[in-house]
A protein has these predicted regions:
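Conserved alpha-helical "signature site"
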Residues: 1-242
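Divalent metal-dependent phosphate-bond-processing catalytic cores, especially two-metal-ion Mg2+/Mn2+ enzymes
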Residues: 188-198, 217-304
Length: 304
């Protein structure tokens, strides 16, 4: 346990289909047919997977009609990751009185996931889907803290809105833990692969003493999280100005030109995905996001 204040028994239980999908994600040798059978046990999940596979995001000329076809069309790893993400998306009901806007939280998480995958495809393509999943889950500890320590976490978020200190610093001071530590424990409780647990735990402070894949994923998610904040995609309670970590950019050979390209293209993709899965469009239009991203790009501070 990384967090001393969250009782794992208070963490929402994963539904049976989610548990099956997690076991499926753990078994990389599972055949396409078996993966398809697991997903097709849940009609709603199947419908959402097919909707995404047929969406304009994947730019397919021909429609797919089965999960197996979707795995062939967009890749088995992509379907596994989407299934896992969609299952977890449904575990936490949105709260109208939440410490933060839960819909905007998921928009931020999806944005981070998509930036992470896009960058990882340039750095280590074999880790692209895992970077997506980690990006999606990187702030899951915030939802658990809002659920289990609601009033205390509301006070944390209210302080963070002032923008004078990072959210995780305020969490540590007021709660004795951080959302990254809680996120680690949530994923451990759900028995997700250890790679995800450790990468979520380290996403604010990637350290190279851990496994190389974990370092790459946590480092890329760190950069992706910054880009998501800079382009104003969703919100997760942190108003502290974000810095692009120059040491990580150098480590992964990512130039500011690459960041420029991503910040110009990824927001449109995020809008498409969010609309497909029912989160809807952001309050600010697409062009507002892109224009603001362009203005902010010139203000990037690279932390050396």
């Amino acid at each position: 346990m990384k967090s001393p204040i969250v009782d794992v028994h208070s963490i929402p239980v994963l539904p049976e289909i989610a548990d099956s999908v997690i076991r499926m994600a753990l078994d990389e040798d599972m055949s396409v047919s078996r993966v398809a059978r697991v997903i097709e046990k849940d009609q709603a999940l199947t419908a959402r997977i097919l909707s995404l596979a047929n969406s304009s995001f994947y730019k397919r000329s021909r429609q797919v009609g089965t999960v197996k076809d979707a795995m062939v069309a967009i890749g088995a790893e992509a379907v596994r990751t989407l299934a896992l993400g969609l299952c977890i998306l449904n575990v936490f009901p949105s709260r109208r009185d939440g410490a933060f806007d839960h819909k905007e939280f998921w928009r931020h998480s999806i944005g981070c996931a998509m930036y992470a995958e896009a960058m990882m495809n340039r750095v280590s393509p074999q880790l692209g889907a895992k970077a997506f999943c980690t990006g999606l889950l990187h702030d899951i500890g915030k939802l658990v803290l809002d659920l289990t320590r609601h009033e205390e976490y509301r006070a944390v978020v209210e302080q963070a809105r002032e923008g004078s200190r990072p959210l995780d610093e305020i969490e540590k001071e007021l709660l004795g833990t951080t959302h990254a530590e809680v996120g680690h424990d949530v994923l451990a409780h759900w028995k997700l692969p250890r790679l995800y647990e450790e990468s979520v735990w380290c996403h604010h402070a990637p350290v190279q003493v851990i496994d190389e894949d974990q370092f790459r994923i946590s480092g890329i998610v760190n950069i992706a999280n910054t880009l998501t904040h800079m382009t104003g995609i969703g919100g997760s309670g942190n108003s502290y100005p974000q810095l692009v970590p120059g040491s990580l950019l150098k480590k992964f050979s990512l130039s500011e030109t690459v960041l420029d390209e991503l910040m110009a293209s990824v927001p449109r993709q995020i809008d498409l995905i969010c609309e497909e899965i029912g989160i809807g469009k952001p309050a600010e239009g697409l062009f507002g996001l892109v224009n603001r991203a362009s203005m902010r790009l010139s203000e990037i501070s690279v932390k050396l």
